[in-house]
Amino acid sequence: MAVTLVIGGARSGKSRHAEQLVAATPSVTYVATGQPDDGSDPEWSARVAQHRARRPGAWSSVETLDLVEVIEGSAGALVVDCLGTWLTGLVDRAGAWDELGRAGAVVREQTTALCRALDAAGADVVLVTNEVGMALVPQTPSGRFFQDQLGTLNACVAAVADHVHLVVAGRVLDLSNAPLVP
């Protein structure tokens, strides 16, 4: 079983690429980590609709932040989209955006648990994530927290992944054989 991390910027094609990686797999579950679409944000609704329209009808879908549980219980391939919204959801669920120390503890605990589950995964798992480390350093504490925590999360997942693909402007770079930073 393989774990693949697909990382890229907004609208880079990373989700399409992740979906293509498992397109020939008979049993796929799409794991959406973003906030459910309640129709209150038309732009978000359009993004969700675009993602749904692209997926094969045979795929099952689940909306959850409980990634460890899903990974440990899966017999078929998983596409997790995406780790950035997962991290945001964890901090939202903890109500900790104003308590970044507590938020950091929650994220570290969940990151460790996720990486352990991925290391022991019994099915193919493709995870989509945002590359935010190439952007400007945010001016707000919560923005810097998010950027730093997502960078740490991405590095942890990349360390246990069999494959790492960077998607930039619709092009895929395979980083799977690139050395890890010690």
Description of each model-found segment:
Residues 33, 82, 129:
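Short, conserved active-site loops that position catalytic residues or coordinate cofactors/metal ions
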Residues 2-73:
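Conserved P-loop
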Residues 28, 78, 164-166:
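Short, well-ordered beta-strand core segments
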Residues 18, 51, 79, 130, ...:
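Residue-level signal for inorganic ion chemistry
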Residues 5, 79, 126-128:
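Structural motif
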Residues 35-36, 85, 133-135:
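A short, flexible beta-alpha/helix-coil linker loop
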Residues 54-94, 98-110, 118-119:
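Portal/gating segments that form or line small-molecule/metal binding sites
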